[in-house]
Amino acid sequence: MPRRKKSETTNEGTTVVVDEKLEVDNSIGPTLYQRDENGLLKNVQYIFNDDGSVNWRAMIKEEHLFPNKGWFESRGKDCPKSTEGLEDHQLLIKLGGIKELAKLRGFSSVCYETVKCEKDHVAVSCAINFSPNYETNAEPILFEDMANATFNNTSSFATKFLETIACNRAFVRAVRNFLNVHIVGDDEIDKSNASNMTTEQSISVGPTSILK
């Protein structure tokens, strides 16, 4: 059991240090963080579609969403300061929001495989073992998706971390595609500058068609 140091002053005016036992109760977390027979967290209120499936899009907190500045700029429009009234294709979701969705859904493992690794082009696949729930007839589901990061679709700073960018993009894509979330991840979009593009064109599997 952990101990806390406690100072006491005696009648003689000297100070002694006494070990004091701390009462520790770690039962609160495990008690709250449990899943029911349907595979849903007991301490979370889920939102459902008309067919009874979980509306994972509705489970995303507003703090994880922000306007897609590039979408508005490409159309000569001012980017709004809030997400109010915006459609899903006008939004981006932060990596933290995707991680929270994955946590709410439940998973047992995440596995990355490097498909291609070159100086200017890294492609990675991400396979996630999603935990059983009532939506999958109590069966675990393995879902896999992939993404790439190149000099042509990352910022000048991010070109130093192509492997990390590719892994994040693949993870984001796997989670949101499995959960049927059509908001593009902030990590997925092309953040390159025209001046930083290489002359050699790379094949991109980015969500360009979704952003249009």
Model-predicted segments: where are they?
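Polyanion-binding surfaces on beta-sheet-dominated domains and ring/shell assemblies
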Residues: 2-212
